[in-house]
Amino acid sequence: MKLCGFEVGLDQPLFLIAGPCVIESMQLQLDVAGKLKEITGKLGVNFIFKSSFDKANRTSGTSFRGPGLEEGLKVLDAVKRQIGVPVLTDVHEYTPMNEVAAVVDVLQTPAFLVRQTDFIKNVCAAGKPVNIKKGQFLAPWDMKPVVDKAKSTGNAQIMVCERGASFGYNNLVSDMRSLSVMRDTGCPVVFDATHSVQLPGGQGSSSGGQREFVPVLARAAVAVGISGLFAETHPDPSKALSDGPNAWPLDRMEELLETLMELDAVTKKHGFARFA
């Protein structure tokens, strides 16, 4: 599949979707995007910048949600033009899809909305590549009907994303078998290494996280074989306005990516024979 001018798939090098969880300010987004472009350019990694203009599913109604659609699109457009990288953002049921699609290169659907048929179809009908996040409550094989809905719009540029599965209360686990299972959708598979270490609602009025396990799960996913890695990052996760506990520090992105790209090359060297 071609995405933002480059090929993605299990016969292609790992690509990266990364950026702060939410748009905090114009300058922060430009700084992070610029640093990520520098890192990925050095390592030869295809890169898509990610950030959200509205986090509609925050645990608390008083938590920071973002700058909103109008200001958020201005920021994403500035990142795209000034830094020169493609951009991705997530959309919601109330989002004017065509307005967002006029600015961003890739649309993303939140995990909680994966079963909303009309929503999935509306997003995919906008004509942009779409990254569909698997719900924390959904079996990996249940992504096939979701993809069928998405592709019924005529949009063939669909990716599926694993972001962990609910394991009791306030906890997620990553079943690496799901990465193999979701290949059967015929779509490139992306692994979300940062939301997979989230502890949903684990801090009462906000979600916790165990960012120390980001490299553990990222290495495991790359060893299984994935097309892309999703990772939220921040210069100072302790001060991030959303999902700081599971964000990976920006100053450690290069060392993480360097390891993952080496592992990715080894994993993909001999292909992916199906085991009986």
Swiss-Prot record:
GO terms for biological process: keto-3-deoxy-D-manno-octulosonic acid biosynthetic process. GO terms for cellular component: cytoplasm. Its main location: cytoplasm. Pfam families: DAHP_synth_1. Pathway: Carbohydrate biosynthesis; 3-deoxy-D-manno-octulosonate biosynthesis; 3-deoxy-D-manno-octulosonate from D-ribulose 5-phosphate: step 2/3; Bacterial outer membrane biogenesis; lipopolysaccharide biosynthesis. NCBIfam families: KDO8P_synth (TIGR01362), PRK05198.1 (NF003543). Keywords: Cytoplasm, Lipopolysaccharide biosynthesis, Transferase. It is an enzyme of class 2 (transferase). It catalyses: D-arabinose 5-phosphate + phosphoenolpyruvate + H2O = 3-deoxy-alpha-D-manno-2-octulosonate-8-phosphate + phosphate. GO terms for molecular function: 3-deoxy-8-phosphooctulonate synthase activity. SUPFAM superfamilies: Aldolase. The gene is kdsA. Belongs to the KdsA family. Signal peptide: none annotated. Transmembrane segments: none annotated. This is 2-dehydro-3-deoxyphosphooctonate aldolase. It is found in: Cytoplasm. Its EC number is 2.5.1.55. It comes from the Bacteria.
